[in-house]
Amino acid sequence: MRGTRLMGLLLALAGLLQLGLSLKIAAFNIRTFGETKMSNATLASYIVRIVRRYDIVLIQEVRDSHLVAVGKLLDYLNQDDPNTYHYVVSEPLGRNSYKERYLFLFRPNKVSVLDTYQYDDGCESCGNDSFSREPAVVKFSSHSTKVKEFAIVALHSAPSDAVAEINSLYDVYLDVQQKWHLNDVMLMGDFNADCSYVTSSQWSSIRLRTSSTFQWLIPDSADTTATSTNCAYDRIVVAGSLLQSSVVPGSAAPFDFQAAYGLSNEMALAISDHYPVEVTLT
């Protein structure tokens, strides 16, 4: 009996050690994330609960001109320790008066930010830019995983231009390679990569999909929406042998927070109409 208990304890400790050495990453489109949402204590508590699952999380649809909502979120996340989460945030992005930011939240005890940049996609006023919201790129150093340095490219595509924007992510990858001499890159976000925005016949024209360089971790069969639709809008794509070999098999999936927390449809949709998509690295 004592030996059985000891074995159980050792297995539990091994599991905790493995958890400590792994890295959990997600992309989460929080619909209209701003002061109104973060002023609702119930919604804020669920958002905080979801974010705390991750070591790095990309939040999209940040509608927060003065970063008041971002500040509130960080206050909640760091209420016990001011260094639990740090952040990187983009400038407001968009071709017209409607603007969004990309927000990266990360645990500094697990990763460090080495560099950041905003992808230059051409002349917006000339009408020859590639993206409605130019991808934000962050280079991370991981303290524990097989891949020690990797970049994350964030994209929330414009639904009407999803095919062209996803295709243009191929050029963003080449730009990251050239700028940082880095092959290990994760491209993620709400690509609007399914249903009427990207049809099955259009995939053959998307280089990010046809090139063998890239692995698509969230399949077309996934449902990343909290609505009645069944669409794999949100994706995680990885390139580079070290990063690809660091992915825990079967770990990439949407996180259905409605089912996990027993929420009503109304409450789930109040949080967001998208589920986070997540993956674990070791």
Swiss-Prot record:
Gene responsible for this protein: DNASE1
Signal peptide: 1-22
Maturation and modification: The only differences between the A and B forms and the C and D forms are in the compositions of the carbohydrate bound to Asn-40.
GO cellular component: extracellular region; nuclear envelope; nucleus; zymogen granule
Pfam families from the UniProt entry: Exo_endo_phos
UniProt protein name: Deoxyribonuclease-1
Site entry (Involved in actin-binding), positions: E35, V89
Cited InterPro entries: Deoxyribonuclease-1_AS (IPR018057), DNase_I (IPR016202), DNASE_I_2 (IPR033125), Endo/exonu/phosph_ase_sf (IPR036691), Endo/exonuclease/phosphatase (IPR005135)
Site features described as Nitration by tetranitromethane destroys a Ca(2+) binding site and inactivates enzyme, chain residue numbers: Y87
Record keywords: Actin-binding, Apoptosis, Calcium, Cytoplasmic vesicle, Disulfide bond, Endonuclease, Glycoprotein, Hydrolase, Nuclease, Nucleus, Secreted, Signal
CDD domains from the UniProt entry: DNase1-like
Function: Serum endocuclease secreted into body fluids by a wide variety of exocrine and endocrine organs. Expressed by non-hematopoietic tissues and preferentially cleaves protein-free DNA. Among other functions, seems to be involved in cell death by apoptosis. Binds specifically to G-actin and blocks actin polymerization. Together with DNASE1L3, plays a key role in degrading neutrophil extracellular traps (NETs). NETs are mainly composed of DNA fibers and are released by neutrophils to bind pathogens during inflammation.
UniProt subcellular location: Secreted; Zymogen granule; Nucleus envelope
Reaction(s) this enzyme catalyzes, per UniProt: Endonucleolytic cleavage to 5'-phosphodinucleotide and 5'-phosphooligonucleotide end-products
Cofactor(s) needed for function: Ca(2+); Mg(2+)
